[in-house]
């Protein structure tokens, strides 16, 4: 049974130097056409299941114009949601204002994820991000007036970042008291601007020190370390991301989206051009029983609680 859905909105006003996700510079006509094709893909494949989680990611979904944001919201009303649902919308802090928050709240969104990465403006140039600590804090506090469930993305092991730099970010996060933190070490992927600039990743021993600093700091300040990279206040774990780590079925719609349905993993094209011409899928793989069990184990080991032996037996009729 499918209880989760991911929607990819691959448009940004500015491309971060580290980003390896499917993304394109914002163009109103291209976005308008993209949303038309997104609606077609959903209409063709969604079977009216009642969903527990819906996640709108990118790219930068909040970068859409008012008209296209309303168009997206209308398309998303296609999905039926459980009474106890989780509906996440990713935002760039610069896009956040009362009008946006009001629109999202009035259309069933109940969780906001803000891609902060760092509050330290000395990394603006190398990350190709506009970093304004004062505005970031103001926008997060504004979001808290509308939503009780907020995630912040924190990136560490940035080029030239010190332990003290990271501590400063963590101290700000502590004061903001949001419900969820996702943390990621910077990985310099091929075909990114950082790779082209020949920037090197932070040494492993420093990365490890930073990781354990984050773990200890957040655990000591009321966060449950429930997955390798994720921390949550009690009862605020990301139910959508747990869908992935529990190896459960989920839809993936939009260019660059992936899904897992009836033992088949699939990836959509990363080309918005191809997607807008109706050429959505590029890859499908039907997994064998052994492959399914292997994935179950590997994904479960990302969770701090590890493998649920009862669930594994129920799925595969095999005792661990």
Enumerate the language-model features and the residues they cover:
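Immediate flanking context of iron-sulfur cluster ligation sites
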Residues: 1-9
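C-terminal scaffold of the Radical SAM
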Residues: 2, 24-44, 52-318
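Local cysteine-cluster metal-coordination motifs and their immediate loop/turn environment
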Residues: 10-23
């Amino acid at each position: 049974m499918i209880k989760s859905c991911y929607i990819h909105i691959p448009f940004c006003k500015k491309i971060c130097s580290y980003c390896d996700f499917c993304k394109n510079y914002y163009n109103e006509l291209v976005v308008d056409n993209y949303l038309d094709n997104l609606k077609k893909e959903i209409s063709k494949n969604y079977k009216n299941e009642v969903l527990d989680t819906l996640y709108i990611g990118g790219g930068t979904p909040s970068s859409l114009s008012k008209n296209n944001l309303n168009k997206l919201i209308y398309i998303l009303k296609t999905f039926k949601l459980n009474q106890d649902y989780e509906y996440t919308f990713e935002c760039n802090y610069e896009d956040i204002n009362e009008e946006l928050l009001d629109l999202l709240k009035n259309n069933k969104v109940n969780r906001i994820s803000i891609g902060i990465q760092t509050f330290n403006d000395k990394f603006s140039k190398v990350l190709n991000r506009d970093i304004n600590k004062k505005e970031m804090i103001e926008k997060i506090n504004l979001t808290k007036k509308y939503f009780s469930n907020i995630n912040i993305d924190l990136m560490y092991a940035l080029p030239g970042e010190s332990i003290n730099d990271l501590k400063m970010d963590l101290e700000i996060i502590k004061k903001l008291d949001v419900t969820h933190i996702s943390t990621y070490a910077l990985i310099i992927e091929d075909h990114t601007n950082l790779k082209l600039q020949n920037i090197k990743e932070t040494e492993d021993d420093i990365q490890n020190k930073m990781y354990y600093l984050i773990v200890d700091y957040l655990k000591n300040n009321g966060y449950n370390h429930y997955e390798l990279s994720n921390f949550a206040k009690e009862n605020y774990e990301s139910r959508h991301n747990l869908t992935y780590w529990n190896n459960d079925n989920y839809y993936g719609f939009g260019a660059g989206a992936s899904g897992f349905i009836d033992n088949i993993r699939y990836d959509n094209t990363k080309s918005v051009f191809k997607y807008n011409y109706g050429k959505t899928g590029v890859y499908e793989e039907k997994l064998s029983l052994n492959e399914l069990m292997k994935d179950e184990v590997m994904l479960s080991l990302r969770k701090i609680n590890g493998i649920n032996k009862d669930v594994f037996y129920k799925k595969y009729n095999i005792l661990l």
